[in-house]
């Protein structure tokens, strides 16, 4: 899977841009605030229809413009498809090969990406919401059905919470049954993904850190026992809701379910967020991304595109070297941003292009 051409119009601070990326490494360099990350963000949006920086489409449109256009020509197995995303204050519209796409199923899989940004290290010590967001995005990248289940659960949860706030009992049990059914599917999908990722995570942590520390990743259901979730998830979820029923009525919100669950990152048998150094946390998150890359390749039989934001800020020389070795060994298209080319030894890589970014201009 490769992006052969990219066209951007009125996106963020970027001026009208046309790129013909290299098949392997593409390096965008320049001072902070010039628009480097915006280029990676545009690729991510073309792949997922979401930004990794904002939830509002209006934030993505260049100041003074009424809309933005993103286009990417993606080659896979000898077939090239044109992906076009239109952005305005009403939201996003998608076209594939100039045909409107209304169902996410018809869009899924045309462009697979893995992104690593400096902010993602924050999820180690941050709120559970950050780790859930990471996990949901990763599961969706590999499972076309997950997003529709997630949206269905969110709608049911909203209705159930509304009934709790109003103290209405008439249809409450029906909404609880629906919540359990969709919640079960989310938990099972998350568990399956983590099970598939676990051995890859261990392998790549050794590669990136250069040591034999033991890492693991574990799902932490809220008000549920993990062993029960691996048995009958629906029963475990229903029991958790029954246990929290009195407190739910008092607080007017649903207190158990995948919207409250967490993911625990583990180092040498202990929580990484409490006992891991900053370097260990960086290595762990990067190993997660490497594992995700390998998993997508195995699932789709095609290498995803790797987006690496701000190489200079998050990695020391040893981790940087190990990451570059990982990327060089794969027939993978890579887009990297950095403040200086001195952060990357371009003499050691093949098939690359460099671009200087200055005030929204892409200079070759």
UniProtKB/Swiss-Prot annotation:
GO terms for biological process: DNA replication; DNA synthesis involved in DNA repair; double-strand break repair; SOS response. InterPro entries: DNA-binding_RecF, DNA-binding_RecF_CS, P-loop_NTPase, RecF/RecN/SMC_N, RecF_2. It holds the Pfam family SMC_N. GO terms for molecular function: ATP binding; single-stranded DNA binding. It is found in: Cytoplasm. Keywords: ATP-binding, Cytoplasm, DNA damage, DNA repair, DNA replication, DNA-binding, Nucleotide-binding, SOS response. ATP binds at residues 30-37. Its main location: cytoplasm. SUPFAM superfamilies: P-loop containing nucleoside triphosphate hydrolases. One of its GO terms (cellular component) is cytoplasm. It comes from the Bacteria. Belongs to the RecF family. HAMAP family: RecF. NCBIfam families: recf. The RecF protein is involved in DNA metabolism; it is required for DNA replication and normal SOS inducibility. RecF binds preferentially to single-stranded, linear DNA. It also seems to bind ATP. This is DNA replication and repair protein RecF. It comes from Geotalea daltonii (strain DSM 22248 / JCM 15807 / FRC-32) (Geobacter daltonii).
């Amino acid at each position: 899977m490769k992006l052969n051409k990219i066209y951007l119009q009125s996106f963020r601070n970027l001026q009208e841009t046309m790129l013909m990326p290299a098949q392997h490494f593409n390096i965008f360099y320049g001072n902070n605030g010039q628009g480097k990350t915006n280029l990676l963000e545009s690729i991510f949006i073309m792949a997922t229809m979401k930004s990794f920086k904002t939830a509002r489409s209006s934030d993505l449109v260049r100041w003074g413009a009424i809309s933005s256009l993103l286009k990417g020509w993606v080659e896979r197995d000898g077939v090239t498809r044109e992906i076009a995303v239109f952005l305005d204050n009403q939201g996003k519209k998608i076209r594939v090969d100039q045909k409107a796409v209304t169902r996410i199923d018809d869009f899924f899989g045309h462009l697979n990406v893995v992104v690593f940004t400096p902010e993602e290290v924050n999820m180690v010590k941050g709120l559970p919401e950050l780790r859930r967001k990471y996990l949901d995005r990763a599961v969706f990248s590999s499972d076309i059905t997950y997003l529709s289940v997630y949206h269905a659960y969110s709608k049911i949860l909203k209705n159930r919470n509304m009934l709790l706030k109003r103290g209405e009992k008439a249809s409450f049990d029906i909404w609880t049954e629906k919540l359990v059914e969709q919640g079960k599917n989310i938990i099972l999908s998350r568990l399956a993904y983590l099970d598939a990722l676990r051995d890859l995570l261990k392998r790549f942590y050794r590669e990136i850190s250069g040591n034999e520390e033991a890492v693991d990743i574990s799902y932490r259901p809220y008000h549920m026992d993990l062993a029960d979730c691996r048995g009958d998830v629906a029963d475990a979820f229903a029991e958790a809701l029954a246990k929290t029923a009195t407190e739910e009525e008092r607080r007017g919100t649903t207190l158990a379910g995948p919207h409250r669950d967490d993911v625990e990152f583990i180092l040498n048998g202990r929580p990484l967020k409490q006992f891991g150094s900053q370097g260990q946390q960086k290595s762990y998150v990067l190993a997660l991304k490497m594992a995700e890359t390998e998993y997508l390749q195995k699932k789709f039989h095609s290498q995803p595109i790797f987006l690496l934001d701000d190489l200079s800020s998050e990695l020391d020389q040893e981790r940087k070297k190990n990451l570059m070795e990982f990327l060089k060994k794969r027939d993978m298209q890579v887009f990297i941003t950095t403040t200086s080319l001195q952060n990357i030894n371009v003499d050691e890589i093949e098939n690359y292009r460099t671009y200087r970014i200055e005030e929204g201009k892409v200079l070759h």
